[in-house]
């Protein structure tokens, strides 16, 4: 046919031009020195790693001129198309006339060219051929071509039998059963609800407030597609309160001191009213019977006797008061010590004009100064004795002079 041959030649010419234009990006025979700065492709080393080849030809143009080939030629073309992957790995070497005229084949209508599942169309064709085998030869339209094309009256009146071409079962061709740790999908029905995430609550009944609520989301890829899948997604719908405790964390343990006090107070509340014998310093034999947890050691018993008139709240208040008193006394002691060091520094002659003298230096200088003071004290004591003796001599001489 002149129209088909002209279109096929144009397609082949366009493919060869595209092949020549991008061939130096993928092969080693291109001179990089000549076209180094003109090329916008990545470095050649990257393409060597992937070993890329030219892309396959585009979808064949459906020219509606002429009539389709005979069923025998169509079957031969389909077998050649299916066996091509095992023989070749490069460009598709198909006859352009057969490719353009074979519009009634189900292979050309598969998901690679028309974006829908080929297995569904094959099932449809097989079911229609089994039910309408007598009427299929008289129909003027192919079953695999959309019905909104008005110019398909001159096409072939019969489709290729998929059972004669495809040997694998049609019902399970494109359906897979995917199952992971938290995902399960089956092909029993299109409207089946698939539980994607399953959360098992192993916590107490008091934590059911923080439970995760499943949300059903309907996803529809095509508005005209009757298939619909529902997914259960577990969403944690709790507000983020960063001050609150985590729902998965266990309650914090109280300090051991408070535990002991609680164990001591609980038997005391459950026991009978106290008797005056409890005031004695020695533990009575009734005390261990009333509080078995405290009877382990005598120290616990004495502690129990001392802590009876106070509750945990009052004991906490007493601890706070003791801590405050201790801090006040410690602060006062430090202030007194600092003031005394300053007074000692002022007494040393060499450190009066040194306000930032360390305490060690103050103590060393004070020791040396104290030793000098002791030496001077001894000297002055000796001088005092000498002066007293001299005074005694002078008084005796004066008395002798008066007698004379």
From Swiss-Prot:
An example Gene Ontology biological process: regulation of transcription by RNA polymerase II
InterPro entries membership: bHLH_dom, HLH_DNA-bd_sf, Myc_transcription_factors, Tscrpt_reg_Myc, Tscrpt_reg_Myc_N
Comp. bias regions, Polar residues: 287-315
Keywords: DNA-binding, Nucleus
The keyword Signal belongs to this UniProt entry's keyword annotation: no
PANTHER family assigned to the protein according to its UniProt record, in alphabetical order: MYC PROTO-ONCOGENE (PTHR45851)
Protein name (record): Protein L-Myc-1b
Organism: Danio rerio (Zebrafish)
Gene: mycl1b
